UniProtKB/Swiss-Prot annotation:
Subcellular localization, as worded in the UniProt entry: Cytoplasm
Family membership noted in the UniProt record: Belongs to the RimP family.
Classification of source organism: Bacteria, Bacillati, Cyanobacteriota, Cyanophyceae, Synechococcales
Keyword Cytoplasm found: yes
Official protein name in the record: Ribosome maturation factor RimP
Keywords for the protein's UniProt record, in alphabetical order: Cytoplasm, Ribosome biogenesis
Location (main, coarse): cytoplasm
Length: 155
């Protein structure tokens, strides 16, 4: 598929998405596959989570528009997905959902170096973040925290 047709396809899919309060945040066309694979990543314009139903409801009109456009004259597989969960914890909902999960906490040190602590998310308050590091609870003031991310627990 040439760049011009890819741009036309992207514009077509964005129109379908906009009509459903969605936006395209990723389009990957794998022409080296047989059949061609069209991967579309969507998100809601209002920031709400994407459900499986949202993906399914976008699939049919997207497929219909691709067929009507005649931009592809070969068989293809259409895959619709969401961005998934971000590794970085930012909202109150994230902290409640992932309590007990392994996290990396990036700290800003006084000497301008970054220190990373690894433990289980224990508690978040207005003033501090608490993580469980090998059975000991460490309270970290939020003014020292740069970033909190989900991870795999290290020994």
């Amino acid at each position: 598929m040439n760049k011009e047709n890819k741009s036309k396809l992207e514009a077509l899919l964005e129109k379908v998405a906009n009509e459903r309060d969605l936006e395209i945040c990723g389009l990957n066309i794998q022409t080296n596959q047989n059949p061609v694979v069209i991967e579309i990543t969507i998100r809601k314009t209002n920031g709400d989570d994407i459900s499986l139903d949202d993906c399914a409801l976008f699939n049919t009109p997207a497929s219909d528009e691709i067929e009507k456009s005649n931009l592809l004259n070969c068989s293809y597989v259409l895959e619709i997905s969401s961005q998934g969960v971000s590794d970085e914890l930012t909202s109150e909902r994230d902290f409640k959902t992932f309590k007990g999960f392994p996290v990396n906490v990036e700290l800003n040190q006084k000497n301008s170096k970054i220190k990373i602590l690894n433990g289980l998310l224990y508690e978040k308050s207005k003033d501090y973040l608490a993580i469980n590091i090998k059975g000991k609870i460490k309270k970290i003031p939020f003014d020292e925290v740069l970033k909190i991310s989900l991870c795999t627990l290290k020994d």
